[in-house]
């Protein structure tokens, strides 16, 4: 299938417009696949993103502001998502010693184990791009980087 068939639109203003619509459509499609992958463990794709960010910085804590800056979806309500992870004991929060207005967030052992479990299913996530060769995936990544300048 192509984007024209997927969204039932035959005409676009130009190829850049078509590419932009295709990127947006593909973003939604990939997020749905990612949701299927992480929902098996009872978390959302935004929670998964935060846990991965925290694991990458572990054991050093991050403020919610630092987490938001690193998130894929910058429009997410980071504080609310962190609170949901806290209620699942996947993260812990501590008032920042340097600035009491900030909260430091770290991933817990339970959060690390959950990510380890999801890492064991990484092939399922890689399947999202299974129609691409390694070379094509690399080329796509370079093109997406180029779009962002």
Where are the language model's segments positioned?
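N-terminal leader segment of winged-helix/HTH proteins
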Residues: 1-41, 88-90
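Charged, amphipathic alpha-helical coiled-coil/dimerization segments
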Residues: 5, 83-142
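Pre-recognition alpha-helix immediately N-terminal to the DNA-recognition helix
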Residues: 22, 49-53, 113, 139
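Short, locally clustered residues in the helix-turn-helix/winged-helix DNA-binding domain
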Residues: 24, 52-59, 119, 145
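N-terminal helix-turn-helix DNA-binding core of bacterial DNA-binding proteins
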Residues: 32-74
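Short, hydrophobic-biased segments on the C-terminal half of alpha helices
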Residues: 64, 82-83
């Amino acid at each position: 299938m192509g984007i024209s068939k997927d969204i039932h639109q035959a005409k676009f203003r130009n190829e850049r417009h078509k590419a932009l619509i295709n990127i947006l459509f593909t973003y939604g499609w990939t997020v749905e696949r990612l949701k299927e992958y992480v929902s098996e463990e009872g978390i959302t794709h935004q929670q998964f993103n935060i846990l991965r960010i925290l694991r990458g910085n572990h054991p050093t804590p991050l403020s919610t502001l630092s987490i938001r800056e690193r998130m894929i979806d910058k429009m997410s309500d980071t504080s609310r998502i962190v609170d949901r992870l806290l209620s699942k004991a996947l993260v812990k929060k501590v008032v920042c010693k340097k600035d009491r207005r900030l909260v430091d967030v770290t991933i817990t052992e339970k959060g690390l184990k959950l990510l380890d479990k999801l890492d064991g299913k990484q092939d399922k996530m890689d399947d999202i791009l299974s129609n691409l060769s390694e070379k094509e995936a690399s080329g796509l990544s370079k093109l997406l980087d180029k779009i962002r300048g």
